[in-house]
A protein has these predicted regions:
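N-terminal glycine-/serine-/threonine-rich phosphate-binding loop
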Residues: 1-47
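CN hydrolase (nitrilase-like) catalytic-core segments centered on the catalytic cysteine
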Residues: 71-89, 155-251
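Short beta-strand scaffold segments in enzyme catalytic cores
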Residues: 92-94, 104-108, 137, 233-235, ...
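Active-site-proximal beta-strand elements of phosphoester/diester hydrolases
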Residues: 11-23, 105, 117-119, 138, ...
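Active-site glycine-rich loop that binds ribose-phosphate moieties when present
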Residues: 124-137, 152-158
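Active-site beta-strand/loop signature of hydrolases that rely on acidic residues for catalysis
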Residues: 29, 40-67, 90-91, 153, ...
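A short, polar/charged loop-to-alpha-helix boundary motif
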Residues: 120-133, 249-261
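Short, glycine-anchored, charge-dense loop/turn motifs used at functional sites
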Residues: 106-115, 236-243
């Protein structure tokens, strides 16, 4: 990745995207991802991190198997190519169709190529239609080694431990925790946001301190056709302290500098 302009201090500048990801609209979501990559480029970032299932939107494979996509799908490959055009790497989410199975997957692309994937190793409620990933991936990114934790994986130790044991120096937590019941006013949005702040951000803080690693979060935000998501983009330091974050549940992006020494 020579020529990508990593920071002189050895750190990595990252854009964390808490965006709305429409269900069943890979092309529309692709356009939004490309816009975010351009925003990241203009902000001097080397990496953009997107939420769980960001490209496909959340998918229930038992009900809508047609919304899951293979890794060679045009939208997956086009987004990988866009990382070369923007000179910004990307970690993005999809519901992956793999032969007769489905996985919840984060794909890492850089320099115009799909480099590798992390499949979800610990499933949450209502995810029985998915297969469990068995491998732990770590992606080299300049001076950083990136591990990935996907939503419900944050609530257990073994996924974090496996990524740390594989050499991850920075852990990226990508989530799409659908809220039970629609959000219809500010009070209901705030209630869902507070739950995820306590649960999701709380897990990020606990594991950051336990493992002595930086943790960066990107969560789906806003309303889709039949489900709402609580947002939160944040950076947590190795002591478990939140050093940067978006203020509430609304969609947005957050640029952070992560030390790697």
């Amino acid at each position: 990745m020579a020529g990508w302009g990593f920071r002189d201090d050895g750190g990595v500048r990252v854009l964390l995207a808490s965006i709305t990801c429409a269900k069943g609209d890979a092309e529309g979501n692709l356009a939004r991802h490309v816009e975010v990559l351009d925003e990241a480029r203009r902000a001097g970032c080397e990496l953009a991190v997107f939420p769980e299932m960001s490209l496909t939107g959340s998918v229930e494979p038992d009900r809508h198997p047609e919304r899951a996509v293979p890794l060679d799908h045009a939208a997956v490959q086009r987004l990988a190519e866009a990382t070369g055009e923007a000179e910004v790497a990307a970690l993005y989410g999809l519901a992956e169709a793999a032969d007769d199975r489905f996985f919840i997957t984060q794909a890492y692309a850089a320099g115009g190529q799909l480099v590798g994937v992390q499949r979800k190793r610990h499933l949450g409620e209502d995810e029985e239609g998915y297969a469990v990933g068995t491998d732990t991936a770590v992606f080299g990114h300049g001076p950083a080694r990136l591990g990935v934790v996907i939503c419900a994986e944050a609530g257990v130790d073994h996924t974090w431990d496996a990524s740390a044991a594989a050499g991850a120096s920075v852990l990226l937590m990508c989530s799409a925790p659908g809220l039970y019941g629609r959000r219809t006013d500010e009070a209901s949005w705030r209630s869902g946001f507070t739950w995820w702040e306590d649960c999701g951000l709380g897990d990020a803080r606990r594991h950051a301190a336990r493992l002595g690693r930086w943790v960066a979060m990107a969560t789906q935000a806003g309303s889709t056709a039949d489900e709402d998501f609580p947002g939160i983009a944040a950076l947590v330091d190795p002591a478990g302290e939140v050093v940067a974050r978006l203020p509430d549940w609304r969609p947005g992006t957050l640029v952070v500098d992560i030390p790697t020494d």
